[in-house]
Amino acid sequence: MAEMELWFTEQQTPDLGFTCKITKTIYTAKTKYQDLAILETKQFGKMLVLDGAVQTTIVDEFCYHELIAHVPLFTHPNPKKVAVIGGGDGGVIREILKHEEVEKAYLIEIDQEVIEASKKYLPEISCALDDKRAEVIITDGIKFVSENKNMFDVIIVDSTDPVGPAVGLFESNFYQAVYECLKEDGLFVAQTESPFYDQDLIRNVFHSIKSIFPITRLYLGFIPTYPSGLWSFTMGSKKYDPLEIDTSKIKRIDTRYYNPELHKALFALPTFVQKIIE
């Protein structure tokens, strides 16, 4: 008798699914906030899934984590205090702590079970969460940002998709609170979904940020397991422009995706993406 195959499908739009073969269900839980699963896949290794959406995989996580962390941290000349909103898997913290000038990196995560599961089953990604420079705070990111003023050099919003607990992280009043939470020369980056499937969201977020921050930039990266593969990030900066940095300093850290030549290329947008944010 043939062995039964198990497949996982993420419904990425109402009309499109992303499907991969599962060799093992490592862990599942219903947390206070979401359904959590860690699956072993044939193609992408271990995969973290929240509410049916792929968050990260062992094979392609470096693409996302390097792009969301290093672009802002190399844009700011001296990022000593950094906060990550969301990102309970710990991948962004791992990348942040490659920067020696960072004195403290705070992980602000609403769902403690995501952190615990990542520490137990995804050590390759969560390995820096016990670093002495990292501090984990279990609270709502919106609440944390609105209660702290003039505190951080860089804030990274590593949110889930704009459903469930993350909805408020894509709204204008949140970006205003981020502005106030940053120091006078601070900057922030948020993941802002796919230019193929989320054009209205990208447009709205870009213009919300642009109305608050003097410098607003959109950049793109490739993450194979994310909807369409093409992914956007939006930066709001009070002072520093990512297009004007000395990219030679990027060589000092160990990366697999991001490099000096790529930095400026990330901001070269296809015409259809330029039109989204006009």
Curated annotation (Swiss-Prot):
It is found in: Cytoplasm. The active site is at D158. PANTHER family: SPERMIDINE SYNTHASE, SPERMIDINE/SPERMINE SYNTHASE. Catalyzes the irreversible transfer of a propylamine group from the amino donor S-adenosylmethioninamine (decarboxy-AdoMet) to putrescine (1,4-diaminobutane) to yield spermidine. One of its GO terms (molecular function) is spermidine synthase activity. It is an enzyme of class 2 (transferase). The lineage of its organism: Bacteria, Bacillati, Bacillota, Bacillota incertae sedis, Caldicellulosiruptorales. One of its GO terms (cellular component) is cytosol. Keywords: Cytoplasm, Polyamine biosynthesis, Spermidine biosynthesis, Transferase. Belongs to the spermidine/spermine synthase family. S-methyl-5'-thioadenosine binds at Q34, E109, D140, G141, P165. It holds the Pfam family Spermine_synth. GO terms for biological process: spermidine biosynthetic process. This is Polyamine aminopropyltransferase. It catalyses: S-adenosyl 3-(methylsulfanyl)propylamine + putrescine = S-methyl-5'-thioadenosine + spermidine + H(+). InterPro entries: PABS (IPR030374), PABS_CS (IPR030373), SAM-dependent_MTases_sf (IPR029063), Spermi_synthase (IPR001045), Spermidine_synt_N (IPR035246), Spermidine_synt_N_sf (IPR037163). PROSITE patterns: PABS_1 (PS01330), PABS_2 (PS51006). Spermidine binds at H65, D89, D158, S159, T160, D161. The gene is speE. NCBIfam families: PRK00811.1, speE. Homodimer or homotetramer.
